[in-house]
Amino acid sequence: MKAIILAGGHSERFGKAKAFAEIDGQLFYQRIVQTLQETNMFNDIIISTNDQLANQFKHDNVIIDDANNKNKGPLAGIHTVMKQYNDEELFFVISVDTPMVTGKAISALYQFLVSRLIEDQIDIAAYSEHNRVIPTIAFYHPNCINVMDEALASNDYSLRHVYNNVTTECLDVTNIQSPEYWYKNINYQEDLDDLKQQINH
């Protein structure tokens, strides 16, 4: 099973590439890599990014988005990696701007997926908040590839396009009680300031 860290966004709202922002003395991407490694669930951790940022990562496996799908957001990153590893059975996707994700949360979502697979075929198992799917904390099955192809060829290459057209099951974020900020994504510098305050509270 492989993990994909989505780190190719332009981060206009944040002011710089979020992958290299710091929390608790660690860069966001390095913290997530460490969390993923500590789960012992993944045989590979892949950073998905763009050609401008790729050489700034100190990581063994960095994959640049397919040039044909440039500027098509996180879907392009997930699709590029899944196409390269087309014999893999499952991918965990996490956005680099969710630095406090925990191994407990990742493991719980995997257990949720496995328990549902006994009854049904599930293509995406994601977290949700207030019934809103969080597609960047999710497991993706390769069955999604055809719908991803269609989405990238259309004018709607949102992840919503994908999860609405495959079998998606969600686990509410409140199932993981601590820390309460584990799933928060950082869009603005103020979000990072708030997170630091919560951590040090």
UniProtKB/Swiss-Prot annotation:
Name of the protein this chain belongs to: Probable molybdenum cofactor guanylyltransferase
What Gene Ontology terms describe what this protein does at the molecular function level?
GTP binding; metal ion binding; molybdenum cofactor guanylyltransferase activity
What species is given as this protein's source? Staphylococcus haemolyticus (strain JCSC1435)
Matching Pfam families: NTP_transf_3
- PANTHER family linked to this entry: MOLYBDENUM COFACTOR GUANYLYLTRANSFERASE (PTHR19136:SF81)
Give Gene Ontology CC terms: cytoplasm
Entry similarity comment: Belongs to the MobA family.
Residues binding GTP: L6, A7, G8, K18, D65, D97
What is this protein for, i.e. what is its function? Transfers a GMP moiety from GTP to Mo-molybdopterin (Mo-MPT) cofactor (Moco or molybdenum cofactor) to form Mo-molybdopterin guanine dinucleotide (Mo-MGD) cofactor.
Its EC number is 2.7.7.77
| GO process terms (BP) | Mo-molybdopterin cofactor biosynthetic process
**Residues annotated as binding Mg(2+):** D97
**If you read the UniProt record, what top EC class would you report for this enzyme, in one word?**
transferase
Q: List where in the cell it is found.
A: Cytoplasm
Give the classification, highest ranks.
Bacteria, Bacillati, Bacillota, Bacilli, Bacillales
Alphabetized UniProt keyword annotations:
Cytoplasm, GTP-binding, Magnesium, Metal-binding, Molybdenum cofactor biosynthesis, Nucleotide-binding, Transferase
What the entry lists under InterPro entries is as follows: MobA-like_NTP_Trfase (IPR025877), Molybde_CF_guanTrfase (IPR013482), Nucleotide-diphossugar_trans (IPR029044)
List the catalysed reactions: Mo-molybdopterin + GTP + H(+) = Mo-molybdopterin guanine dinucleotide + diphosphate
Name the cofactor(s) required for activity, per the record: Mg(2+)
Q: Give the domain note.
A: The N-terminal domain determines nucleotide recognition and specific binding, while the C-terminal domain determines the specific binding to the target protein.
Q: What is its main location?
A: cytoplasm
